[in-house]
Curated annotation (Swiss-Prot):
Region Disordered, annotated ranges: 1-55, 428-502, 591-814, 944-985
Binding site for Zn(2+): C310, C313, C333, C336
Gene3D superfamilies hit by this protein: 3.30.60.90, Homeodomain-like, Winged helix-like DNA-binding domain superfamily/Winged helix DNA-binding domain
Entries under PROSITE patterns matching the protein: SANT, SWIRM, ZF_ZZ_1, ZF_ZZ_2
Classification lineage: Eukaryota, Viridiplantae, Streptophyta, Embryophyta, Tracheophyta
Subcellular location: Nucleus
Protein name (record): SWI/SNF complex subunit SWI3D
Domain SWIRM: 145-242
Compositional bias segments (type: Polar residues): 662-671, 725-736, 780-800, 965-985
Role this protein plays: Component of a multiprotein complex equivalent of the SWI/SNF complex, an ATP-dependent chromatin-remodeling complex, which is required for the positive and negative regulation of gene expression of a large number of genes. It changes chromatin structure by altering DNA-histone contacts within a nucleosome, leading eventually to a change in nucleosome position, thus facilitating or repressing binding of gene-specific transcription factors.
């Protein structure tokens, strides 16, 4: 039976294995392993006598378990001890899966580590860059004018709305001596003085050299600039490290007001900037920040409070009284008020309760409306008598009344609100004008055309008729004013072009900054979870947490990594003793003022010298110059109607005539060569324009050197007296540069025609100026060198007509190109610096506030623990008192107990007839009797027989004398009836 079972089990095992793995069917090895497995299974389950043969499912489960978990053994690895390999596919699958998981984990782990290491390296590089920038700032020369980042609004040429709001007296037009021009001149003078030497400390006495404005205006402007750190800002640490403590104290007293921005007060926050500060009441520049200790010291100097007496009973009611505002100096004490001891025309509602503070200055924090009304009433009655005013208010001291009156916003706030409307409206109009370029372009040509028309009328009246003998001379000189007119128009166009380019650049800059800021704002609102629509406006007040929304906007604007690194670096700077490191980290170099602001006298002197030389050399040629100018205008008006082919043909003829001998003198040729060499060797640069030469003036022959640069600077400053002289100078220089020569017949014809039709000439000049303004200076000056030398008459008109007809969108393309060129130049570096400074300041402020909160929490915790200790001590003292009381009661009870024991012993001794011991009353007996055995008789001493009980005696029988004597010897004070009472009990 046993063998059949084994064979059947082996057959079943072999069948199961063959069904799972067909490849192992012809091999005989699985039978032996199956049998061995069966024997092992029987050995494991041998304890169960009622178990049947193992099924196929159980065998498969056991084989899988053996395949996945190798058996633990100590013997040799034989075939009998090996795990059955009937399921190789399952074992291989498990092994391959484990290997794949291990390889996958090993593959992901290096990637994560690599990314982490990369982030760490980038962070270290960013911190190293910030520290390098900081070290560069620290090692910078102190002669460089640096300002804090929050002064990025400052501009040498413009007035910011912040300046208009802070100093409204210069912009509201209410004071004659205070205008925007006066403010700009004072500001630029002070800034220029400090910019030239940043190591100095500008004070009020240094402003005596300035002749513009009064002393108060100078002081206001200086303190405003000092407050913002534009002057007297020295962020660089001192080089001498061995200074003493006294030197540091002196330096701290003389520090600029700006350093207070980087120090955070514990008691109160930094107050906002006062719009109209009282500069006369400030002894030092630090007076802009109110000193909280001044009021306390002022209050400490106050004398005792005023005493008040009741009008009814004359009692002292200074502590608590009832005051009647209807009648002066009428006060009642509490008892009289409750008793109703006041006049018949008064009621209890007419009185107010007055309870002064315990000490001076305690009640200065809050002022009720009634107290404020009393203060104003007292000011009207007593004027400047503050003792009477304090007595009238009754609840405040004199110092408190004075301080409250100084802090009251009486009318300054309302005046400031009125003043703010004018600058805002002015800004809106300025923005509208700057954005509307067409209106600017229309107004400028009209003024130029009107001015030109007056000059042309005067010129046409003074033109003399040429004689027959001088026809050749007039024809030769008539070519010179043509070029002069052309150069004059080009000069006027160049003067207007920088204004157009400046307006376009500013608009492009504003658009670029606005787009980046709006993008950062949109992303910040999305990060906070606020769904924004194109129609809705962004407002931090709509957010659930406006503070976090603002922080997200600043981080988006500056960059998360840069903002975090800068905040950490600023927090690390808190370990220093002052805010010097913070000030040094957040500052930048202020750009130099424009050249025309630096040395305006130089250009004026140069132009004056040039005008003087021209007047001396051409004093006798002014009538001829005027006639030449009229002839040139007529030639230009005729050539505008000529086609391009005729112009080219005429140009060739004029060039051929020039090449003939005798057409031009050797002197003029030598002068022309010298002028050309001078122009080719010295490129033209303009001070007012920031564009390179190839943008403003692509043709060098078009732009003369000194002759054109000086009229460009001082063209608007020429007086009416020297105007003709300057025009003659320009025409003479242009005539030297012009080579061609017009024929005599054409010139005479054009001259006569210009005399006949002066209105057409003026109209043509106006159209030319209009086209020059609309198309820009680049189109006016874009004529090549050859056309300049070959076309003295039609060179300017032909390109203008062609440009106006062929490129109608030239202005839009030019504006687009300038926008693309200025986007890289006018980036948002200042905006990013401001955002970084704001985030760093917020981080430092939060760190300081966190420290203050921690200190306050620690202080409150300490006070709480101290209070608990006081309570515990109070409880322990109560327990000690209770314990002492208990001990006293216990001692008293113990004494009572001892007395009772003694009395009991005496009673027992008296009953037994034994003389009591001679011990003291408080001493215990020799043999104490337990309390539980009260009726047990006392044993007699050793050697004595137990006494017999007394014999009953008749009532009248006398007591033996021995007993009486024994009783007397004990010295007991108890009477005999007492013993009878005890015995009876």
């Amino acid at each position: 039976m046993e063998e059949k079972r084994r064979d059947s089990a082996g057959t079943l095992a072999f069948a199961g294995s063959s069904g799972d793995s067909p490849a192992s069917e012809p091999m005989p090895a699985p039978r032996r392993r199956g049998g061995g497995l069966k024997r092992k299974a029987n050995a494991l389950g041998g304890s169960n006598f009622f178990s049947s043969a193992p099924s196929k499912r159980m065998l498969t489960r056991e084989k899988a378990m053996l395949a996945s978990f190798s058996p633990v053994h100590n013997g040799p690895l034989t075939r009998a001890r090996q795990a059955p390999s009937i399921m190789p596919s399952a074992a291989d699958g498990v092994k391959s899966e484990v290997l794949n998981v291990a390889v996958g984990a090993d593959g992901e782990k290096p990637k994560e580590e690599e990314e982490r290491n990369k982030a760490i390296r980038e962070w270290e590089a960013l911190e190293a860059k910030i520290e390098a920038d900081f070290e560069a700032i620290r090692s910078r020369d102190s002669n460089v004018h640096v300002v804090p980042n929050h002064c990025g609004w400052f501009s040498w040429e413009k007035i910011h709305p912040l300046e208009e709001r802070s100093l409204p007296s210069f912009f509201n037009g209410k004071l004659e001596g205070r205008t925007s021009e006066v403010y700009r001149e004072i500001r630029n003078w002070i800034m220029g003085k400090f910019h030239s030497n940043p190591n100095i400390q500008i004070e009020l006495k240094d402003l005596t050299e300035l002749e513009v404005g009064d002393s108060e205006a100078k002081q206001e402007v200086m303190e405003f600039l000092d407050y913002w750190g534009l002057i007297n800002f020295h962020p660089f640490p001192p080089t001498d490290t061995g200074s003493t403590a006294s030197d540091h104290d002196d330096l701290g007293d003389k520090e600029s007001l700006l350093n207070s921005l980087y120090r955070f007060q514990v008691d109160e926050a930094c107050p906002p900037l006062v719009h109209k500060p009282r500069f006369t009441a400030q002894a030092t520049p630090s007076g802009l920040f109110p000193d909280p200790m001044a009021a306390d010291e002022l209050l400490k100097q106050e004398g005792p409070a005023v005493e008040y007496h009741c009008n009814s009973c004359s009692a002292d009611c200074s502590r608590k009284r009832y005051h009647c505002p209807k009648q002066a100096d009428f006060d009642l004490c509490t008892e009289c008020f409750n008793s109703g001891k006041f006049s018949s025309d008064m009621s209890s509602s007419d009185f107010i309760l007055m309870e002064p503070a315990e000490a001076p200055g305690v009640g200065s924090g809050k002022w009720t409306d009634q107290e404020t009304l009393l203060l104003l009433e007292a000011l009207e009655i007593f004027k400047e008598n503050w003792n009477e005013i304090a007595e009238h208010v009754a609840t405040k001291t004199k110092a408190q009344c004075m301080l409250h009156f100084l802090q009251m916003p009486i009318e300054d706030a309302f005046l400031d609100q009125i003043d703010y409307k004018d600058p805002i409206s002015k800004d809106t109009t300025d923005l509208a004008v700057s954005k509307d370029d067409n209106s600017v372009l229309k107004d400028a040509p009209e003024e130029a055309e009107n001015k030109k028309r007056v000059d042309e009328d005067e010129t046409m009246k003074e033109v003399p008729e040429p004689e027959d003998g001088n026809e050749e001379k007039v024809s030769q000189e008539s070519s010179k004013p043509g070029d002069a007119s052309e150069e004059t128009n080009e000069m006027e166009a160049e003067q207007k072009t920088p204004k157009l380019e400046t307006a376009i650049e500013e608009r492009c800059k504003d658009e670029a900054d606005e787009n980046i800021a709006l993008k950062a704002l949109t992303e910040a609102f999305e990060d906070v979870g606020h769904s924004s629509t194109p129609e809705a406006s962004f407002s931090f007040a709509d957010l659930g947490n406006p503070v976090m929304g603002l922080a997200a906007f600043l981080v988006r604007l500056a960059g998360s990594d840069v903002a975090t690194a800068s905040a950490r670096a600023s927090i690390k700077s808190l370990h220093s003793n002052s805010g010097m490191l913070l000030a040094t980290r957040h500052c930048y170099i202020l750009e130099d003022p424009p050249d025309n602001k630096k040395d305006p006298t130089k250009s004026k002197s140069c132009s004056a010298d040039a005008e003087g030389n021209d007047d001396n050399s051409h004093k006798d040629d002014q009538p001829e110059e005027k006639s030449k100018k009229a002839e040139e205008v007529s030639l230009n008006s005729d050539d505008r109607e000529m086609p391009d082919t005729d112009t080219g043909k005429e140009t060739q003829d004029s060039v051929s005539e020039e090449k003939q001998p005798g057409s031009r003198t050797e002197n003029s040729t030598t002068k022309l060569d010298a002028v050309q060499e001078k122009r080719s060797s010295k490129p033209v640069t303009t001070d007012n324009s920031e564009k390179p030469v190839d943008i403003i003036c692509p043709s060098q022959d078009k732009c003369s050197g000194k002759e054109l640069q000086e009229p460009l600077k001082d063209g608007n400053k020429l007086s009416s007296e020297n105007k003709d002289a300057s025009q003659s100078t320009v025409s003479q220089s242009a005539a030297d540069a012009s080579q061609p020569e017009a024929s005599r017949d054409v010139e005479m014809k054009d001259t006569l025609q210009s005399e006949k039709d002066p209105e057409d000439v003026v109209k043509t000049v106006g159209e030319k100026v209009q086209l020059a303004k609309e198309e820009g200076a680049n189109d006016v000056l874009s004529t090549p060198d050859k056309s300049v030398s070959q076309q003295p008459i039609g060179s300017a008109s032909a390109p203008e007509n062609g440009t106006a007809g062929g490129n109608p969108n030239i202005e839009g393309k030019k504006e687009k190109d300038i926008c693309e060129g200025t986007k890289d130049k006018y980036n948002i570096e200042k905006l990013k610096r401001a955002a970084i400074s704001a985030i760093s300041a917020a981080a430092v402020k939060a760190k300081n506030l966190a420290k203050q909160e921690e200190d306050q929490i620690r202080q409150l915790s300490g006070s709480l623990i101290e209070k608990q200790l006081h309570k515990l001590e109070a409880k322990l003292s109560i327990f000690n008192e209770a314990e002492s009381l208990t001990m006293r009661v216990r001692e008293q009870l113990e004494r009572s107990r001892q007395r009772l024991y003694h009395e009991r012993a005496q009673i027992i001794a008296a009953r037994l007839g034994v003389p009591p011991s001679m011990s003291s009353k408080a001493s215990l007996p020799t043999n104490r009797i337990a309390a539980n055995f009260a009726n047990v008789a006392q044993r007699p001493p050793m050697g004595m027989a137990f006494p017999r009980p007394p014999m009953p005696r008749p009532p009248g029988f006398p007591v033996p004398g021995s007993f009486v004597a024994a009783t007397t010897m004990t010295g007991s004070s108890d009477p005999s009836p007492g013993s009878d009472n005890v015995s009876s009990v």
